[in-house]
C-alpha cells in the first residue's frame, strides 16, 4: 500500500483505517484474520457490487441494502450509544437520503430483508427513538425528515 502512497491513519484507533492524501479509507477483509473480525455482509455485497463512473475513475458500489446491512452489523458490534455512533449516523443518513432504499431492500435476498427488518424493529421500538434519530438529522429540517425516516423504517418492517 505504501507504494501507492496509502499509509495507516496514525491518529485513528480503527484497525483497518488508512490515509490516501487527505482521504480516510477503511480496508476490511472479507474473511476473519489474525488482525481482527470482518463484516459478514461485505463478501455478498461485493459479489453484487456494480460499477459507477466518477469522472475518469470507475469504482464498485455495494447495493444499498447490503451496505445498510453492513452498517447495522458494524453498529451492533461496536456501538453502544446510537446518539454518538458514527455507524448509526450513517444508517440515519442512508434512511434519510436514499430514495431507492426500500425498493432495493424489497428486491434483496430474504436473509438481507430479515436482518434489516430486525434493524427497523429495534430502532422503532427504541425507548428514545425520536432522540436517536433527531440527533443525526439536520436541525433545520428535522421535523419533516424524521417523519420520512420513520416511514421508511415502517416500510422496511413490512417487507419481511
PLM segments and residue spans:
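Compositionally biased terminal segments of proteins
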Residues: 1-160
Amino acid at each position: 500500500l505504501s507504494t501507492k502512497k496509502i499509509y495507516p491513519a496514525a491518529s485513528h484507533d480503527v484497525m483497518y483505517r488508512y490515509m490516501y492524501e487527505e482521504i480516510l479509507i477503511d480496508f476490511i477483509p472479507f474473511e476473519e484474520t489474525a488482525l481482527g473480525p470482518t463484516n459478514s455482509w461485505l463478501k455478498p455485497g461485493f459479489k453484487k457490487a456494480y460499477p459507477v463512473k466518477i469522472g475518469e475513475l470507475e469504482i464498485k458500489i455495494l447495493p444499498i441494502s447490503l451496505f445498510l446491512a453492513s452498517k447495522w452489523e458494524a453498529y451492533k458490534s461496536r456501538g453502544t450509544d446510537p446518539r454518538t455512533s458514527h455507524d448509526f449516523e450513517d444508517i440515519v443518513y442512508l434512511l434519510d437520503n436514499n430514495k431507492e432504499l426500500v425498493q432495493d431492500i424489497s428486491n434483496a435476498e430474504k436473509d438481507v430483508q430479515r436482518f434489516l427488518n430486525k434493524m427497523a424493529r429495534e430502532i422503532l421500538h427504541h425507548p428514545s427513538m425520536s432522540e436517536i434519530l433527531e440527533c443525526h438529522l439536520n436541525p433545520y429540517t428535522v421535523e419533516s425528515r424524521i417523519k420520512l425516516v420513520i416511514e421508511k423504517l415502517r416500510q422496511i418492517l413490512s417487507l419481511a
